[in-house]
Amino acid sequence: MQLNSTEISELIKKRIAQFDVVSEARNTGTIVSVSDGIIRIHGLSEVMQGEMIALPDNRYAMALNLERDSVGAVVMGPYIDLAEGMEVQCTGRILEVPVGRGLLGRVVNTLGQPIDGKGEIKNDGFSPVEVIAPGVIERKSVDQPVQTGYKAVDSMVPIGRGQRELIIGDRQTGKTALAIDTIINQKDSGIKCIYVAIGQKASTIANVVRKLEENGALANTIIVVASASESAALQYLAPYAGCAMGEYFRDRGEDALIIYDDLSKQAVAYRQISLLLRRPPGREAFPGDVFYLHSRLLERAARVNEEYVENFTKGEVKGKTGSLTALPIIETQAGDVSAFVPTNVISITDGQIFLESNLFNAGVRPAVNPGISVSRVGGAAQTKVVKKLAGGIRTALAQYRELAAFAQFASDLDDATRKQLSHGEKVTEMLKQKQYAPLSVAEQAVLLFAVEFGYLDDVELNKIADFETTLLDYANRTNAEFMRELTQSGDYNDEIKNTLEGILNNFKANNTW
């Protein structure tokens, strides 16, 4: 068969005319090295800081180091099978996580994917993990309380909605227990809770989930998990992901509470990433921006005003303020609060609850040290009744600590000193509280009233706990309506004072404990 050159050229021209190519601009690069979860990529000339880079098998890395001839990125997840020469590409997107009410009651990972085996999550949308905090004009002062249910905290170190209150102490001093009890106490308050577990054992997290479920608080809580077995990248990003989920409620005129357990482990994960990326180390080998790591996170916890909420919701929600309260946890080594990360977070937050191992081992639980625990803004948010009745507690404890130190060397003490020591011991005993047993405002008011007006003076020290249990049972049984109203209003006036006086007089006259 002989081919005609004219026919061939016509056929080629026809094919060329019919050929339609769709041009697609793709910013691609090649992996040049993989080590310890860090990949170096050649190419990607248009990549952004913090951009998600698409890897093979539907995985992602986050661009952190933008250098002259390469990009340093941290892999989100397993990296064992990544190899030199693999092609990657830019996505043009910053990391986002799902947000919405569908996350309540669920356990998710850093990327918002469910890990509790309860099926898909119906989210209301996505939110970037890194968001600029509300400005000065958009904020409102803190004047509403967050009740922890702990007498020692609500009376001496009150927390307000929109506040950042640090929980700091050595390992095994009850930091997580305080945070979990605070979540349990919110189940009827309308405050949505987010618990971010960073670098913890999976068994510990499972225990927390079980306790919240047993106490009926899981339905009101989102649990974000970056366990010890997760990559450093996911541990570093977990607090930001949890914060984005909490901001969903804050920006819609609702109240949310977020607990970061704990930011020491997040700082260690960030240090690991920074050293692997060959960033210059500073004090304690942390990178230079470790302060910014925590400040940009904790500044997002705020109380925002009505205009902010109205503008954000485009007029759907009017006349409501929103808040995100943060309780970051920091673990100290041998009580050293002057280390790098603890001092940073103390300077960022609005106060700290310092839990002391000596007090914890002595049986004072919660082991709050009233001397160096402080709340810088919570006083304005404290309920009126607790504020009025708890005024003398901190002073009594301070005087007791001072006198107790001298009393060790003095053999004979005068009556006034003995009385003060006895009062201090009884106040310390009264502030002790069991785990998973938060008290209402009214119950705290009854006990504080008993301390303030000397109803404990004739009660033996070893009988204080029994006295407390029997008194609360009596008050709730005989004055249920009054206790309910006092918890709701938190008010204090002559009428309430007389009622409290009547409860205690009747109780002491008719009850044994």
Curated annotation (Swiss-Prot):
Spans traversing the lipid bilayer: none
E.C. numbers: 7.1.2.2
Site (Required for activity): 373
PROSITE patterns reported for this sequence: ATPASE_ALPHA_BETA (PS00152)
Single GO molecular function: proton-transporting ATP synthase activity, rotational mechanism
Keywords, in A-Z order: ATP synthesis, ATP-binding, Cell inner membrane, Cell membrane, CF(1), Hydrogen ion transport, Ion transport, Membrane, Nucleotide-binding, Translocase, Transport
Enzyme's top EC category: translocase
Bilayer topology: Peripheral membrane protein
Reaction catalysed by this enzyme: ATP + H2O + 4 H(+)(in) = ADP + phosphate + 5 H(+)(out)
Role this protein plays: Produces ATP from ADP in the presence of a proton gradient across the membrane. The alpha chain is a regulatory subunit.
Similarity section: Belongs to the ATPase alpha/beta chains family.
Name used for this protein in its record: ATP synthase subunit alpha
Native source species: Actinobacillus succinogenes (strain ATCC 55618 / DSM 22257 / CCUG 43843 / 130Z)
